[in-house]
Amino acid sequence: MKRVLFLTNYASPYRVHFYDELAKSMDVTVLFTDRVEDQKNRSADWFVSGGGAYRPVQLKRCVAHLLDENLCLDVTGWLKKPYDAIVICGYSSPTAILAMRWLRRRKIPFYMEVDGGLIRQERKIKYLFKRSLVRKADQWLSSGRYTTEFLVHYGAEKSRIHVYPFSSVFEKDILP
């Protein structure tokens, strides 16, 4: 069975369902950098627990609220384990940046998954920084056309972007 590792911020409901579905066909481990109880923008009722199909791992905070983000140094211990694929969700958190740099230094390929993004006018230094982060991935997972445009804008190679149908709608939710 294929083994896949995801690194993301917190267990949002649509992601939990996605990981549960994916875990029906492969061994899925998901590393979370943020705790649900620390989310101030969301009601606790918004979060759901998974169906138990994937393995959730709460990383330990080393530096809390670094630029309102967590830095979890224990991520590297998980990256040392053998996986068929490693997926970094997003590109800008301190833990994601640490993970990408660690993987690149060891020439371990990884995917970057992005679920949306807006192309804005920004200072050149900010654009170049974002571009340097996005370009670190070997391949990209995009949730749709606008995300693909965002990734290409920041240096992703279009031929290595994989668009996947991402939805939180289940067959049972569709009206007859």
Predicted regions and their residues:
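Short N-terminal targeting/anchoring amphipathic segment
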Residues: 5, 75-94, 109
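A short helix->loop->beta-strand "cap" motif at the edges of active sites that frequently abuts
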Residues: 106-109, 158-159
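N-terminal subdomain of nucleotide-sugar transferases
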Residues: 1-58, 79
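Donor nucleotide-sugar binding/catalytic pocket of nucleotide-sugar-dependent glycosyltransferases
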Residues: 135-176
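A short, histidine- and acid-enriched strand-loop-helix "catalytic/donor-clamping" loop
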Residues: 94, 108-126, 136-139, 143, ...
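Short, well-ordered alpha-helical microsegments
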Residues: 13-16, 94-97, 148-149
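A short, charged, and often flexible helix/loop element on the N-terminal side
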Residues: 50-73, 88-89
